[in-house]
Design a protein with these regions (language model features):
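Terminal substrate-recognition subdomain of acyl/acetyltransferases
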Residues: 240-245, 249-278, 517-519, 530-553
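Short alpha-helical scaffold element within the canonical Hanks-type protein kinase domain
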Residues: 149-153, 425-429
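Conserved ATP-binding subdomain of kinase catalytic cores across diverse folds
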Residues: 20-136, 142-143, 155-166, 170-171, ...
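Hydrophobic residue at the +6 position relative to the catalytic HRD Asp in the kinase catalytic loop
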Residues: 173-180, 449-456
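Short, glycine/acidic-enriched loop or turn micro-motifs at the edges of active sites
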Residues: 126, 175, 195, 451, ...
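Activation-loop N-terminal segment of eukaryotic-like protein kinases
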Residues: 180-185, 456-462
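Juxta-kinase regulatory segment immediately upstream of eukaryotic protein kinase catalytic domains
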Residues: 1-37, 248-311
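C-lobe/activation-segment region of protein kinase-like
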Residues: 189-253, 257, 463-534
Length: 553
């Protein structure tokens, strides 16, 4: 290794690559890589990566980490940068015999001691692909390739065992961080070691956490037998059911954590979302929705509140809801929900937790991303004064062909008794039950799942369902039997009585196909009926609110 210092970068590089990293190259590395025949494979706000032809037939992998704001700059005054950490762990791992792409160099660029960028360079593995791509492209679920898949699973188990035996804990051990070379005969390479650590020994908890990460990343491809093959190669020939169950619980926990993290992307800068300040407001919006349009729609909402309050869908001290037309001649409608912080206590609470409007914005985007709800959220806008939230607005598309569930049921099934109507009603109940089942199976819980908070519309071949009043939605949470019972009671107590006992039992059967719970069906029905009798049935009809007795068998 030789020391290198050029264009503000300082670090180490292998002697045979010293002439490659000149000042001109490092001065604008992204442009230099492309001009030199390289290829950028990742480019984001915090990381850039590319392959670049080196001396002879060698190909280099160059990764640049960018410091995210002043907090990271201060942190890396005391801790090694991501590139330096990956360099140290890679060298130590290779000494222990772990298969890692050969490190070439590490460099940092600092200003007044504060880190701005860091580079990690390694040799690229010729013809290598992530294990996930290998499964997707060549295996899938094709039984004719089963032996090839089992061989790869054994190789994964053997590789992970070797990694753990040498004390390496990778905090992000998913299948995309394992590279398989041509044919896989040379074994698997572990990459992205900036989140890895070398320890004297790994506890069973850390080992199982890594295995759960791996299983979660291959969830679409692994069956129970495949997991047994993995554990056999890992060194546990007889996998106890309790051990496998523990790994699966950890995988579910990882899934819920990823969902919560992914849902918050709508609060950050990305290719889909942006955030900025506009006229004293803090705006979070989709990039295809202009800030000017948002301000026009909020202005139209205020106009209705001040001059035409009878047009409001809801008007209470805490929330005001209106329906406005989108600007610039669009035929679409937008639902604007305004949250007021009228009391001092409400303003204080807003300092310590997300506002209801922001909760709705995050939940709506996650439901839309997963295809659970078809309504597209447009923006969340808030205004604060002296650090205290004063008001906020949540804007979401609201097509005119959607109806609240209770209104749709009355319109479609209240007066029909023909065979076609009965078949249509049964098909509707099946689709509705599966929609609620998918909601819960996706670790999403709606705390106020009355039918007036569910929208329905017909489409060719079925129905679309969407959810509103999303400030009571919890993401990444296990929907327990207690929470399931709560939602089923809310639905049961807001459905008109002309849907009989048989219809409701069919709904439950189809729901349990998607989201089974550890409770006997008979006990669940009994519990739903008992809780429903305490509340009574209330739903909205064209004539107003209707109250009925709870149906019994």
């Amino acid at each position: 290794m030789v020391r290198l210092s050029a264009r503000g970068y300082r670090g180490f590089v292998r002697k045979d690559f010293r002439d490659l990293f000149t000042g001109d190259f490092l001065g604008n590395i992204e442009v230099a890589v492309l001009r030199g025949g390289g290829e950028a494979i990742k480019d984001s706000r915090v990381r850039w990566a590319a392959t670049y032809p080196g001396p002879g037939d060698q190909v280099l992998f160059i990764k640049k980490f960018k410091a995210k704001g002043w907090k990271e700059r201060v942190k890396y005054l005391f801790l090694p940068s991501k590139a330096k950490r990956e360099w140290d762990v890679s060298l130590a791992s290779r000494e222990k015999g772990v298969r890692i792409p050969a490190p070439v160099g590490v460099m940092e660029r600092r200003r007044w001691g504060f880190l701005e960028e860091s580079l990690y360079i390694s040799e690229a593995v010729e013809g290598a692909h992530p294990v996930t791509d290998f499964f997707k492209e060549r295996l899938g679920r094709d039984d004719s390739k089963g032996e090839e898949g089992r061989r790869l699973i054994r190789l994964l188990g053997d590789t992970v065992r070797h990694i753990h035996e040498n004390g390496l804990f990778h905090a992000d051990m998913h299948a995309g961080n394992f590279l398989i070379g041509k044919g896989g005969e040379e074994g698997l390479y572990l990459i992205d070691l900036h989140r890895a650590r070398i320890r004297k020994g790994l506890s069973q908890r850390r080992r199982l956490w890594n295995i759960a990460q791996l299983f979660y990343s291959l969830d679409s491809f692994l069956e129970q037998g495949d997991k047994g093959i993995f554990f056999e190669a890992y060194g546990r020939k007889e996998t106890a059911p309790s051990l496998l169950m523990r790994v699966e619980r950890l995988a579910c926990r990882i899934k819920r954590r990823h969902q919560r993290s992914r849902a918050k992307r709508c609060l950050k800068e990305s290719t889909v979302f942006t955030s900025h300040r506009c006229n004293g407001y803090r705006v979070f919006r989709r990039r295809d929705v202009s800030a000017g349009s948002l301000m026009e729609m909020i202005g139209a909402h205020r106009e209705i509140v001040e001059n035409s309050p009878w047009l409001l869908l809801k008007n209470s001290p805490k929330t005001v809801v209106s329906m406005v037309e989108m600007p610039h001649g669009s035929t679409s409608r937008t639902c604007v929900k305004q949250y007021r912080c009228a009391t001092a206590w409400g303003k204080i609470k807003g300092c310590f937790r997300n506002s209801k409007g922001k909760t709705s914005w995050v939940a709506a985007n996650e439901l839309f991303r997963q295809g659970i709800s078809a309504l597209r959220p447009l923006a969340y806008v808030e205004r604060a004064r002296f650090g205290f939230l004063v008001e906020s607005f949540f804007l979401m598309e609201s097509p005119a062909d959607y109806l609240e569930m209770d209104r749709y049921l009355i319109k479609s099934f209240a007066h029909g008794a023909s065979g076609d109507t009965l078949l249509k009603k049964r098909a509707f109940i099946r689709e509705f039950a599966r929609s609620i089942g998918r909601l819960h199976a996706s670790y999403i819980f709606h705390g106020d799942l009355k039918t007036c908070n569910i929208l329905a519309r017909e489409r060719r071949g079925g129905w679309d369902f969407s959810f509103i009043d999303l400030d009571a939605v919890h993401l990444g949470t296990e929907v327990s039997s207690r929470k399931t019972l709560k939602n089923l009671v809310q639905i049961n107590c807001s459905i008109p009585g002309f849907l009989g006992y048989g219809d409701r039992v069919r709904f439950l059967n189809w729901y349990l196909e998607i989201h089974p719970i550890p409770m006997a069906k008979r006990d669940l029905i009994k519990a739903v009926l008992e809780e429903s009798r305490k509340r009574g049935v209330v739903y909205v009809s064209p004539e107003g609110d209707v109250r009925e007795e709870v149906l019994s068998r």
